[in-house]
C-alpha cells in the first residue's frame, strides 16, 4: 500500500491500527505503535508525507518553557526534546543547539520573564536562567533589551530528515504509508473502525488514531458512531520573511516576550545559517476547509513585521526582508484566549475504545512528536491487538 492511494477495486483492507495523517506526529505515532508489534497503516491525503503543518514551521527544538505545570505540552515537550535529540543522533539527522534568548525590551516586560522562568524550572528546564541587559549585550551586541531569559537547551533540527527517518523506521517494522488517501468518512463501533477515502478506497482496523492536523476536526465529525467531544477549531496563519542576501545576524535564536496567539515574531536560522523571522498571527475562519487554505505570504504585513523586529533589533536594514513561506497552526483556543493545551482524547475521555483523537497539535508538536507517540500507545492499551 506504500506510495499509492487505496483504490475502489481493492477489497477492504484490515489492519491493527490506522493512523490518519502523515505529518511528523502521525508518523511518530505510527512508528511507536509498530514498535509494539502491531500492523500499522498511515493514511495521508497529500502526495508525500510531512508537507502541511510539519514543513511550515520554525524547525525549533523547544526546551519546555512556555507551558503550564502538568500540562501535556509541558510534559511531552520536555520528554520529547530528550527523545528527539537522541533519535537524531542515532539516525544521523542533523541538529544543533544554538540556544535561545527571550528578550524583554522594557521594564514592563520583565515580569513576564519571571513567570516564564518559573514555568521552565517547574517543567524541568534546569539550565534556564535570567540575564541582565549587560550580559545580553555581551552575548548579542545588536539585540536591544533590558533583560532576557537564556535557554541553552533550545535547538534547531532538520525536520525533513526526522520525517524521513520516522517513515523508514515505520516501514522497517512492517508498517505502510498510503498516500493520496484523504479520509472523508467512516464508522466506529466496538468491533473496530472502517474509513472511506475520497479516492474510493476503504480500510478497516481495530483502532483508529486521528492525527490529521488541520483536518482532525473533519475526520472526527465524519465518523458515524462517534459522539464524543470535539473542541472548537481556530486557525492561526503565520507568515515568515527571510533576511535577503545575508546570513544569520545572531548566534542565538532570539524571541520577544510571547504575544496573544503565539510566541511573537522571532528570529531563527536553519542549519545552513539562513536567517528568517516569524511567524506572526493572522486569525483565519475556523470553519475553512483544510484543503482550501491559502499558504501565500501576505506581503502587506511586512511593515508590522519590521516594526516587531526592530523592537529587539533596531539595526534591521530597510528592505532586508523578503517573503519566505507561511504556515497554519491548528489551535483549540482563539483570539484573546489563553493558549490551550494539546487535546489527546482516548477511551477514558470519549468512551470509544477503538479511537484516539489528537486536536490542536501546534507548537511544540515537532519537539514532542516521539513523546506523543509513547503517550498514544499508552492510551491504546491492548485494543489494537
Where are these regions (language model features)?
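Active-site lid/adjacent beta-loop-alpha segment flanking the redox-cofactor pocket in flavoenzymes
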Residues: 226-235, 247-337
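Short beta-strand to alpha-helix junction loop
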Residues: 68-79, 103-112, 149-168, 296-301, ...
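Central helical "cap/lid" subdomain
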Residues: 50, 199-251, 295, 382
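Glycine-rich FAD pyrophosphate-binding loop
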Residues: 35-56
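Flavin (FAD/FMN) cofactor-binding core of flavoprotein oxidoreductases
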Residues: 134-137, 232-238, 300-366, 371-374, ...
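Helical element adjacent to the flavin cofactor pocket in flavoenzyme catalytic cores
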Residues: 149-207, 218, 370, 379
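Dinucleotide-binding Rossmann-like beta1-alpha1 core, especially the glycine-rich loop
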Residues: 59-135, 145, 264-265
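N-terminal Rossmann-like FAD-binding beta1-loop-alpha1 element of flavoenzymes
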Residues: 15-42
Amino acid at each position: 500500500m506504500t506510495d499509492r492511494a487505496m483504490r475502489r477495486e481493492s477489497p477492504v483492507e484490515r489492519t491493527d491500527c490506522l493512523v490518519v495523517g502523515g505529518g511528523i506526529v502521525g508518523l511518530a505515532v505510527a512508528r511507536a505503535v509498530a514498535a509494539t508489534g502491531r500492523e500499522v497503516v498511515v493514511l495521508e491525503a497529500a502526495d508525500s508525507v510531512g508537507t502541511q503543518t510539519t514543513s511550515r514551521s520554525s524547525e525549533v527544538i523547544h526546551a519546555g518553557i512556555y507551558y503550564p505545570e502538568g500540562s501535556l505540552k509541558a510534559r511531552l515537550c520536555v520528554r520529547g526534546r530528550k527523545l528527539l535529540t537522541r533519535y537524531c543522533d542515532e539516525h544521523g539527522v542533523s541538529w544543533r543547539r544554538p540556544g535561545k534568548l527571550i528578550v524583554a525590551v522594557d521594564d514592563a516586560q520583565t515580569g513576564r520573564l519571571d513567570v516564564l522562568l518559573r514555568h521552565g524550572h517547574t517543567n524541568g528546564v534546569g539550565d534556564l536562567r535570567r540575564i541582565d541587559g549587560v550580559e545580553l549585550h555581551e552575548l548579542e551586541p545588536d539585540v536591544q533589551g533590558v533583560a532576557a531569559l537564556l535557554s541553552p537547551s533550545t535547538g534547531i533540527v532538520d525536520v525533513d530528515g526526522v520525517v524521513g527517518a520516522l517513515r523508514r523506521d515505520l516501514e522497517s517494522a512492517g508498517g505502510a504509508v498510503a498516500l493520496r488517501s484523504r479520509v472523508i468518512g467512516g464508522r466506529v463501533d466496538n468491533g473496530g473502525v472502517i474509513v472511506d477515502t475520497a479516492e474510493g478506497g476503504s480500510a478497516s482496523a481495530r483502532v483508529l488514531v486521528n492525527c490529521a492536523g488541520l483536518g482532525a476536526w473533519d475526520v472526527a465529525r465524519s465518523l458515524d458512531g462517534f459522539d464524543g467531544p470535539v473542541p472548537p477549531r481556530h486557525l492561526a496563519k503565520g507568515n515568515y520573511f527571510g533576511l535577503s542576501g545575508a546570513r544569520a545576524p545572531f548566534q542565538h535564536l532570539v524571541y520577544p516576550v510571547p504575544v496573544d496567539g503565539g510566541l511573537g515574531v522571532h528570529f531563527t536560522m536553519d542549519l545552513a545559517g539562513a536567517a528568517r523571522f516569524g511567524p506572526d498571527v493572522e486569525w483565519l475562519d475556523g470553519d475553512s476547509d483544510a484543503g482550501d487554505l491559502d499558504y501565500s505570504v501576505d506581503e502587506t504585513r511586512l511593515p508590522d513585521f519590521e516594526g516587531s523586529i526592530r523592537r529587539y533589533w533596531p539595526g534591521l536594514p530597510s528592505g532586508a526582508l523578503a517573503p519566505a513561506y507561511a504556515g497554519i497552526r491548528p489551535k483549540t483556543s482563539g483570539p484573546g484566549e489563553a493558549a490551550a493545551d494539546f487535546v489527546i482524547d482516548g477511551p477514558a475521555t470519549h468512551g470509544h475504545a477503538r479511537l484516539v483523537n489528537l486536536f490542536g497539535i501546534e507548537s511544540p508538536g515537532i519537539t514532542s512528536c516521539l513523546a506523543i507517540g509513547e503517550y498514544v500507545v499508552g492510551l491504546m492499551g491492548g485494543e489494537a491487538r
